[in-house]
């Protein structure tokens, strides 16, 4: 079970990812977590990343792909993994494809959560209101203004991945506007279909 999750911020990827991890016992690979772990473990790629970050630079796609390559070799990822938050660009997707091909690993699917952006902004605004009403501080990225900026960035940078993966035949779309449990049911049905195909 090797899958990539796509979708704009607020689409519910995090929630669905947690449920996939729980059901299928495969790790969710977050590039941020992997980067920190590689730096802490002082792996060759981690040391390279550390030097770049300490000088204020951005870690290159090659380094991130190297970190993903190391991580998927670990025992808990042998039966599969979920990539969430990577790749973010078509260039990263191509680099990831090349690395996986080198290892003889194939992705099972790229699952895109399709959502209504206007409704998403409304959902975020409501969440911010409810948080404030409880007297709790509202996260900076939970305000409609910041959220719209994040959506714009997603649209420009990451949305082209949908076309890229559609071209590979891996893309599967899920309606992310349905209730959470219904979305989970749709994701499970999709993934069970892949498991049956793999075992037949």
UniProtKB/Swiss-Prot annotation:
GO terms for cellular component: cytoplasm. It holds the Pfam family ADK. SUPFAM superfamilies: P-loop containing nucleoside triphosphate hydrolases. InterPro entries: Adenyl_kin_sub, Adenylat/UMP-CMP_kin, Adenylat_kinase_CS, P-loop_NTPase. Pathway: Purine metabolism; AMP biosynthesis via salvage pathway; AMP from ADP: step 1/1. Residues 126-142 are annotated as: LID. It is an enzyme of class 2 (transferase). Keywords: ATP-binding, Cytoplasm, Kinase, Nucleotide biosynthesis, Nucleotide-binding, Transferase. ATP binds at residues 10-15, 127, 178. Belongs to the adenylate kinase family. This is Adenylate kinase. It comes from Methylorubrum extorquens (strain CM4 / NCIMB 13688).
